[in-house]
From Swiss-Prot:
Cofactor(s) required for function per UniProt: Mg(2+); Zn(2+)
Family: Belongs to the GmhB family.
Site residues, Stabilizes the phosphoryl group: S50, K108
Listed name of the protein: D-glycero-alpha-D-manno-heptose-1,7-bisphosphate 7-phosphatase
Lineage: Bacteria, Bacillati, Bacillota, Clostridia, Eubacteriales
Residue positions binding Zn(2+): C89, H91, C104, C106
Keyword Membrane: no
Gene behind the chain: gmhB
Catalytic residues, chain numbering: D8 (nucleophile), D10 (proton donor)
Keywords for this protein: Capsule biogenesis/degradation, Carbohydrate metabolism, Cytoplasm, Hydrolase, Magnesium, Metal-binding, Zinc
Substrates-to-products reaction catalysed: D-glycero-alpha-D-manno-heptose 1,7-bisphosphate + H2O = D-glycero-alpha-D-manno-heptose 1-phosphate + phosphate
Species name: Clostridium acetobutylicum (strain ATCC 824 / DSM 792 / JCM 1419 / IAM 19013 / LMG 5710 / NBRC 13948 / NRRL B-527 / VKM B-1787 / 2291 / W)
Length: 181
């Protein structure tokens, strides 16, 4: 079985910018590249799980999300780092348009994408972690017995007042990695 770190994307890996999809707007959070590289070097599967409601709302396409993920991989490759997989939910139950307006099991805080990734990568949840800047990023991890960390980047400073007792707080993705390695 494999150990993994499940990462939220916006506000955790990259600077939070509402409905980010343009490559020119992408910016890693401080220490994120180094953190991902350390996770790779320590044999953690690095798996991104992200809600992409901008697709549901019609702001951008799934192809735009995929292009941004390809760009992220190219940037990480320059530093001998990589993300093992990107999973994202393009749905929204209220604000979705057309086929994207639905109540699904993949939109966090539901755990459908976590369950899929756990199965796809044969993940040992007891040796794994989740990191995000919103409680909704971490609830599905906690529901699957994955140790969870709320970062103070993105929305983390606003979310911390509602933190659950089974979640830890850390400054950013890099500080999380230094705590577990």
């Amino acid at each position: 079985m494999n150990k993994a770190v499940f990462l939220d994307r916006d506000g955790t890996i990259n600077v939070e910018k509402n409905y980010l999809y343009k490559i020119e707007d992408f910016e890693f959070t401080e220490g994120a590249v180094e953190a991902i590289k350390l996770l790779n070097q320590n044999e953690y599967k690095v798996i991104v799980i992200s809600n992409q409601a901008g697709v549901a709302r019609g702001y951008y396409t799934e192809e735009a999300v995929d292009k941004l993920h390809e760009y992220i991989q190219k940037q990480l490759k320059k530093y001998d780092a990589h993300i093992d997989a990107f999973y994202y939910c393009p749905h929204h139950p209220i604000h979705g348009v057309g086929k994207y307006k639905l109540q699904c099991k993949c939109r966090k805080p539901e755990d459908g994408l976590y369950k899929r990734a756990i199965k796809d990568f044969n993940i040992d949840v007891e040796k794994s972690y989740a990191v995000g800047d919103k409680l909704s990023d971490l609830i599905p991890a906690v529901d699957n017995n994955i140790k969870s960390f709320l970062v103070m980047t993105g929305y983390g400073k606003e979310e911390v007042k509602n933190i659950k007792t089974d979640m830890r707080i850390t400054k950013n993705l890099y500080s999380f990695v230094t705590e577990i390695i």
